[in-house]
């Protein structure tokens, strides 16, 4: 037995398990990762890298550089993180209706196709080509950016088939065959030559013709511009096929269905893309990054201005909510001083900010001295006086403020030319003048001419104390001037 002391070894207890060795980080070329995320074609992205428009981990990216999972990439003011792609490619078939645009965010607030798609976790849908707002039919979307760029690129010559309804040009009952042959040979558009690779007449009516056309390019509004170059008008346009994928007949508008994985693999094989996972890396947007600051909306004089919609400033006419407070409206003259001469005359007025500007720009006009009574203008009085009553129009009984025939001038003949009861009425017999001061006609055929013209307050019913002649009574014959007025005794 040895006398040498033995050293005791203490084993440390730990709850940590032996971690597996870290897998090497995936590495891919930058432009390939950007294309996989659906940010553009590889050639266009290489040019943007060369122009210094892309940053990796805060530094300007260089042409041909590679990125690894976890690297931070900045592009167009947005931040992304490179991450491994864990699922295979997916393709969605969507039957696009009219009124939807093929953009993620529309500055004019119109509905987009992405609002109707199923949600994704860890990836996003990328549109394969675009359809304008009035075009319906097949729209393909995928999570594979490389597949999307290959199907859209003209070098792959992927066919797009459309059904189109066309109205013949002016002077033609239908689209002539010579025009169809010209479109199949090729015509010159603003951005170069274009043609229909296939064109077939499939029907028509007295006013329209139906065609099936095929193109191998995806230029902006190419089908419509080809027909418009020949003076034809496209009234309906629907895409029915894209490559080997056709629009299912049972798929309703606004609905989508996912393509089977076997067909997705067949698409990649046809385009000679790599089998299996499309790429090792993709981009994920950084969570919580701030949007651009909201801009203030200023309404100009004509009511048009830029507006803030969905975090962006639109250059379109987006002042609908503000312009409604500056609409022109018509005010008609009402009763009182508005409808009469010299009063307020209805016209077009404005309200809101436009009215405030008009009041500030209107010069101050000082009121001059009084000009006295104005003479009536010549011509028809009805043109400038709404209360004018023409001759021959009955407006009320005689003696009333609105007197009838004879109250304003020479009276009309009485029935049977008989005198009234109780003898001749004042001013109604012979050529004598009555109490009314008018000129009577013979045979009692009218009342006397009033002392005052029509409308004068003197013609209104009044009491003796209010009338110029104290002997006048509207209830009986005239009282002699020397007879004093006797007050009726009070009733008990």
From Swiss-Prot:
Transmembrane portions of the chain: none
Query: CDD domains, alphabetically?
Result: S4
The catalytic residues are 132 (nucleophile)
Q: Does the keyword ATP-binding apply?
A: no
- Please provide the Gene Ontology terms (biological process) for this protein: enzyme-directed rRNA pseudouridine synthesis
Keywords on this record?
A: Isomerase, RNA-binding, rRNA processing
Gly residues: bias regions? 420-447
In residue numbers, the region (Disordered) covers: 1-24, 294-492
* Residue ranges with Basic and acidic residues bias: 15-24, 317-334
Q: What reaction is this protein's catalytic activity?
A: uridine(2605) in 23S rRNA = pseudouridine(2605) in 23S rRNA
Q: Which InterPro entries match?
A: PsdUridine_s_RsuA/RluB/E/F_cat, PsdUridine_synth_cat_dom_sf, PsdUridine_synth_RsuA/RluA, PsdUridine_synth_RsuA/RluB/E/F, PsdUridine_synth_RsuA/RluB_CS, RsuA_PseudoU_synthase, S4_RNA-bd, S4_RNA-bd_sf
Enzyme Commission number(s) of this protein: 5.4.99.22
Query: Which molecular function term from Gene Ontology is one that the record holds?
Result: RNA binding
> Where does the record place the S4 RNA-binding domain?
28-97
Question: What is this protein for, i.e. what is its function?
Answer: Responsible for synthesis of pseudouridine from uracil-2605 in 23S ribosomal RNA.
What family name appears in the similarity comment? Belongs to the pseudouridine synthase RsuA family.
Q: What is this protein called?
A: Ribosomal large subunit pseudouridine synthase B
Organism of origin: Xanthomonas campestris pv. campestris (strain ATCC 33913 / DSM 3586 / NCPPB 528 / LMG 568 / P 25)
Q: What is the lineage of its organism?
A: Bacteria, Pseudomonadati, Pseudomonadota, Gammaproteobacteria, Lysobacterales
Per UniProt, what is the name of the gene that codes for the protein in this document?
Answer: rluB
């Amino acid at each position: 037995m040895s006398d040498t002391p033995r050293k005791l070894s203490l084993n440390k207890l730990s709850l940590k398990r032996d971690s597996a060795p870290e897998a090497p980080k995936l590495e891919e070329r930058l432009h390939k990762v950007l294309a996989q995320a659906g940010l553009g074609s590889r050639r266009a992205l290489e040019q943007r890298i060369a122009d210094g428009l892309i940053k990796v981990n805060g530094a300007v990216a260089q042409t041909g550089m590679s990125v690894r999972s976890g690297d931070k990439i900045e592009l167009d003011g947005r931040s992304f993180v490179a991450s491994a792609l864990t699922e295979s490619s997916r393709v969605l078939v969507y039957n696009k209706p009219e009124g939807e645009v093929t953009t993620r965010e529309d500055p004019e607030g119109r509905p987009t196709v992405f609002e109707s798609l199923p949600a994704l976790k860890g990836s996003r849908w990328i549109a394969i080509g675009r359809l304008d707002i009035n075009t319906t039919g097949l729209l393909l979307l995928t999570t594979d950016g490389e597949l999307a760029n290959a199907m859209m690129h003209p070098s792959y010559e992927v066919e797009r088939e459309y059904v189109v309804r066309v109205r013949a040009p002016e002077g033609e009952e239908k689209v002539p065959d010579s025009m169809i042959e010209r479109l199949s040979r090729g015509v010159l558009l603003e951005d170069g030559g274009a043609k229909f690779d296939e064109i077939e007449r499939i029907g028509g009516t007295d006013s329209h013709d139906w065609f099936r056309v095929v193109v191998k390019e995806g230029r902006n509004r190419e089908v419509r511009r080809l027909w418009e170059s020949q003076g034809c008008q496209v009234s309906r346009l629907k895409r029915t096929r894209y490559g080997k994928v056709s629009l299912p007949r049972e798929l309703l508008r606004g609905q989508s269905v996912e393509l089977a994985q076997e067909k997705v693999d067949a698409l990649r094989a046809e385009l000679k893309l790599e089998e299996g996972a499309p790429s090792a890396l993709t981009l994920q947007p950084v969570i919580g990054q701030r949007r651009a600051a909201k801009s203030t909306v200023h309404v100009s004089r004509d009511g048009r201005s830029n507006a803030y919609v969905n975090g962006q400033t639109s250059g379109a006419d987006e002042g609908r909510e503000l312009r409604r407070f500056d609409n022109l409206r018509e005010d008609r003259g009402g009763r009182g001083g508005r409808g009469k001469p010299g009063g307020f005359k209805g016209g077009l007025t404005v309200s809101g900010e436009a009215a405030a500007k008009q009041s500030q720009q209107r010069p101050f006009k000082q009121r001059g001295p009084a000009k006295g009574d104005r003479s009536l203008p010549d011509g028809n009085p009805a043109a400038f006086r709404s209360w004018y009553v023409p001759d021959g129009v009955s407006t009320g009984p005689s003696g009333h403020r609105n007197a009838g025939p004879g109250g304003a001038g020479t009276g009309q003949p009485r029935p049977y030319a008989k005198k009234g009861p109780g003898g001749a009425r004042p001013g109604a017999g012979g050529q004598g003048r009555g109490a009314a001061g008018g000129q009577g006609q013979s045979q009692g055929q009218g009342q006397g001419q009033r002392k005052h013209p029509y409308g004068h307050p003197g013609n209104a019913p009044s009491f003796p104390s209010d009338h110029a002649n104290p002997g006048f009574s509207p209830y009986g014959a005239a009282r002699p001037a020397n007879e004093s007025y006797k007050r009726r005794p009070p009733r008990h």
